[in-house]
């Protein structure tokens, strides 16, 4: 627990104090956000606001992970915990960094061309598929070799699973390894695009991501305290996962980094996370769902992202089939802007929706545990 607290604190402070430096640097480099002409008129005042701020909280998360491990070295946890970095950390941080890199290319092209159109859809899609495939393979093909003090193998789990999961793996829904990789690619694409579509108002995606990541930190730490690698817990209710403390540490660090960034990203935003941050967060959230065996729980935890994504899908289908639009504009937050809601009202109300989704998901997770314990 101490390592997680250290990681959260370090991530928050690094993000809080480095974001204003990034604002100055990106302003000097004229790395301002282009605004699409067909967007809400009130957004034209945001033109030129520094973008690519996701670089800050991605770096803050990586730095905090290292700090958390240093804390784990000097203040060992009473339970089973691997002090050295793990494949799990490689997968989760890799998903965040390389998904963020795809977004960075998109942001860079937007800034360079002074136009809201950056990386084309095919290029972004290929980038997401490549990242999902590479880390999906790593997650499935490298089992843990964790041993106890006597050298006995205590954990052989992989980061991901070939079984579809809700709160745990569902044995009846077994996939092949190829099928599991394809599923994970889909989850990466869905999560990255969900966060990206939500990132349309000051602080909206950042605040929602804080809640989702905090939820995953709680889930992973609970799994760590009831881990099948610990002989004190029975197979009836323990969690068959790999390196849950690592997952909790990274989720907590990312949540802390986002809180620090939110100080500067809240309305009126001094900096935007850009596709760098949105895709980075989406990639990490997808990894969290995979590593905690909660893939089918993700649509509830990230309920706001799902609602906003579905508003775009509904708008497209309606327009192509009937020639009519269901919403004044999509994604959904812009519909309410054009309906006269203030930006702050929309953001706070959407945060409430995000919080409700997180609360329901955590309730389901804990209820399942209680049902097993009896």
UniProtKB/Swiss-Prot annotation:
Its EC number is 2.7.8.13. InterPro entries: Glycosyl_transferase_4 (IPR000715), PNAcMuramoyl-5peptid_Trfase (IPR003524), PNAcMuramoyl-5peptid_Trfase_CS (IPR018480). GO terms for biological process: cell division; cell wall organization; peptidoglycan biosynthetic process; regulation of cell shape. GO terms for cellular component: plasma membrane. CDD domains: GT_MraY. It is an enzyme of class 2 (transferase). Pathway: Cell wall biogenesis; peptidoglycan biosynthesis. Keywords: Cell cycle, Cell division, Cell membrane, Cell shape, Cell wall biogenesis/degradation, Magnesium, Membrane, Metal-binding, Peptidoglycan synthesis, Transferase, Transmembrane, Transmembrane helix. One of its GO terms (molecular function) is phospho-N-acetylmuramoyl-pentapeptide-transferase activity. It comes from the Bacteria. The chain crosses the membrane at residues 3-23, 52-72, 85-105, 125-145, 170-190, 201-221, 244-264, 271-291, 294-314, 350-370. It is a multi-pass membrane protein. PANTHER family: PHOSPHO-N-ACETYLMURAMOYL-PENTAPEPTIDE-TRANSFERASE, PHOSPHO-N-ACETYLMURAMOYL-PENTAPEPTIDE-TRANSFERASE HOMOLOG. This is Phospho-N-acetylmuramoyl-pentapeptide-transferase. It comes from Salinispora tropica (strain ATCC BAA-916 / DSM 44818 / JCM 13857 / NBRC 105044 / CNB-440). The lineage of its organism: Bacteria, Bacillati, Actinomycetota, Actinomycetes, Micromonosporales. The gene is mraY.
């Amino acid at each position: 627990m101490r390592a997680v607290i250290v990681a959260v604190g370090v991530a928050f402070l690094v993000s809080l104090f480095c974001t204003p430096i990034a604002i100055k640097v990106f302003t000097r480099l004229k790395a301002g956000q282009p605004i699409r002409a067909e967007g809400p008129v009130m957004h034209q005042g945001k033109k030129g606001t520094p973008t690519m701020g996701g670089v800050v909280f991605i770096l803050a998360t990586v730095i905090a992970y290292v700090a958390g491990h240093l804390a784990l070295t000097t203040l060992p946890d009473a339970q089973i915990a691997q002090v050295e970095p793990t494949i799990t950390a490689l997968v989760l941080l890799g998903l965040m960094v390389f998904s963020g890199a795809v977004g960075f290319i998109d942001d860079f092209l937007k800034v360079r061309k002074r136009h809201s159109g950056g990386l084309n859809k095919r290029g972004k899609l290929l980038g997401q598929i490549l990242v999902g495939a590479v880390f999906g393979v790593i997650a499935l093909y490298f089992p843990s070799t964790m041993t106890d003090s006597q050298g006995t193998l205590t954990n052989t789990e992989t980061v991901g699973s070939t079984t579809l999961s809700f709160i745990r793996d569902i044995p009846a829904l077994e996939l092949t390894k190829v099928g599991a990789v394809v599923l994970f690619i889909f989850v990466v694409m869905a999560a990255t695009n969900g966060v990206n579509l939500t990132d349309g108002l000051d602080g909206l995606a950042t605040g929602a991501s804080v809640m989702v990541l905090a939820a995953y930190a709680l889930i992973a730490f609970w799994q760590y305290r009831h881990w099948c690698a610990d002989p004190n817990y029975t197979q009836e209710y323990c969690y068959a996962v790999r390196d849950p403390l690592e997952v909790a540490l990274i989720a907590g660090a990312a949540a802390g980094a986002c809180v620090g960034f939110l100080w500067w990203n809240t309305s009126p935003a001094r900096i935007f996370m850009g596709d760098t941050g949105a895709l980075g967060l989406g990639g990490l959230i997808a990894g969290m769902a995979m590593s905690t065996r909660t893939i089918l729980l993700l649509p509830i935890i990230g309920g706001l992202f799902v609602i906003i994504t579905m508003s775009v899908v509904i708008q497209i289908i309606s327009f192509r089939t009937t020639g009519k639009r269901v919403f004044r504009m999509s994604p959904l937050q812009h519909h309410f802007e054009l309906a006269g809601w203030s930006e702050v009202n929309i953001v706070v109300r959407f945060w409430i929706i995000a919080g409700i989704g997180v609360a329901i998901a955590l309730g389901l997770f804990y209820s399942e545990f209680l049902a097993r314990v009896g």
